[in-house]
Amino acid sequence: MRDQRNQDQDVGTPEHRQATLPAEITDAAAGAEAVVFVCATCSVPLTGPLTRLPEVPEAPYYAWWDADEPGPSPATVPSGCYAVETEPYGGPLVVAQAPGPVMPRHGGHWNVEGKPLVSQGPRGNIVINPDDARGLELQHASPACCGATPDGGMNQLCACGTLVATLCSDCCLPYELHLSAEHVRAVRP
């Protein structure tokens, strides 16, 4: 499964796997100061230098049902960038009063009784391109056909054993890694 690849290596991600952003957003990111995200427990770097985007981009369109090979959708956030998620993301999922997206850039989700669900996960996650992560290990991910879903909450371990992030990598979902704002910190490179 793609999630279990060595994230320390440059895997040569094809261009179609990258998000394409409007020039005004990429220009703003180019002028921003880069930071490295480290584990709050052990201070090990979890990313290389990343520059902040003004907001999380919309997930690129991807016809996953027509893909030649199963795997993740194109990344929501371009390589070398990050953005802060302002809405709840990941588990736990709770019954909602009305149907709607279960979390940002996701469609509806229902429990076995047909009731709509919504994320009650944390706000303020740092959203990055999963290919920009270093040294993380997949832990107890909610499985789907081609990868991990964020439904069960954090699923990425630092080398020290601390859960630090939530990977979303199934073919029909946005390809994103959400670093937990409570478990990582930004430092200057």
Each predicted region: which residue ranges?
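N-terminal pre-domain and mature-chain start segments
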Residues: 1-189
